[in-house]
């Protein structure tokens, strides 16, 4: 078995914590960093530090931002009466790429998953309900993923939103079951937004 230095192993371990990065890729990334100049390697560390210091979640929609509220929440060209609920920030990016949605967003930061111990209190559902109480929202578009957890989350949200008298719609099924929005092409997301249906 190949032996690595402690500092090499430490960086491999840190890279391996990233989503989609296994040990082999972590080793390749670490070898790449070894070939970089000290200045380039330090620039990466500085970029990570700056991200952690400056970026936070918007207090309204929970998308990431450097200013609070975020530009998506302060954009006067967006429809305040329409809120799109997504699981993760990357889902906002996928929908924005499609250029088919001009309302507001609400990021839950997860989906209901009782087997993993994730219930309604672990998501940004209460904040969504507060927004519905305080604002003149006419429609909530549920854009959770089309997997078991995403469907369960959408059904739960439809139930708790119902007393507000707000129209609740769901993305059309142009998006394959079991897929994550971030991996779907723009045209498919656009079709799904345009073909949303009421729940």
Swiss-Prot record:
Cited InterPro entries = DNA_Rcmb_RecR, Rcmb_RecR, Rcmb_RecR_Znf, TOPRIM_dom, TOPRIM_RecR
Question: Would the keyword Endoplasmic reticulum be found if you checked this record's keyword annotation?
Answer: no
Short name of one Pfam family = Toprim_4
Any one GO MF annotation of this record: DNA binding
Residue spans annotated as Zn fingers (C4-type) read: 58-73
Keyword Zinc-finger attributed: yes
Q: Which domain of life is it from?
A: Bacteria
Keywords tagged on the record: DNA damage, DNA recombination, DNA repair, Metal-binding, Zinc, Zinc-finger
Question: Can you give the residue ranges of the Toprim domain?
Answer: 81-176
What SMART domains does the annotation carry?
A: TOPRIM
- SUPFAM superfamilies xrefs: Recombination protein RecR
- One GO term of the biological process aspect: DNA recombination
Tell me its family. Belongs to the RecR family.
The protein's matches in PANTHER family, at most eight in alphabetical order, are given as: RECOMBINATION PROTEIN RECR
Report the function annotation for this chain. May play a role in DNA repair. It seems to be involved in an RecBC-independent recombinational process of DNA repair. It may act with RecF and RecO.
What is the name listed in the Swiss-Prot or TrEMBL entry for this protein?
A: Recombination protein RecR
């Amino acid at each position: 078995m190949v032996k690595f230095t402690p500092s090499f192993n430490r960086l491999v371990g840190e890279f391996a914590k990233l989503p989609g990065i296994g040990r082999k890729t972590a080793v390749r990334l670490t070898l790449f960093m070894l070939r970089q100049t000290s200045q380039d390697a330090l620039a990466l560390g500085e970029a990570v530090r700056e991200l952690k210091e400056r970026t936070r979640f918007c207090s309204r929609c929970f998308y990431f931002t450097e200013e609070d509220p975020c530009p998506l929440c302060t954009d006067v060209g967006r429809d305040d009466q329409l809120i799109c609920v997504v699981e993760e920030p990357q889902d906002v990016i996928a929908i924005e790429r499609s250029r088919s949605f001009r309302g507001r967003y609400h990021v839950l930061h997860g989906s209901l998953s009782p087997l993993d111990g994730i219930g309604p209190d672990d998501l940004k559902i209460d904040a969504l309900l507060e927004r519905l109480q305080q604002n003149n929202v006419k429609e909530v578009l549920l854009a959770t993923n089309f997997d078991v957890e995403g469907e369960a989350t959408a059904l739960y949200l439809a139930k708790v939103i119902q007393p507000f008298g707000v129209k609740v719609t769901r993305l059309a099924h142009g998006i394959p079951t079991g897929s994550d929005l971030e991996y779907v092409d723009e045209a498919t997301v656009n079709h799904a937004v345009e073909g949303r249906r009421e729940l």
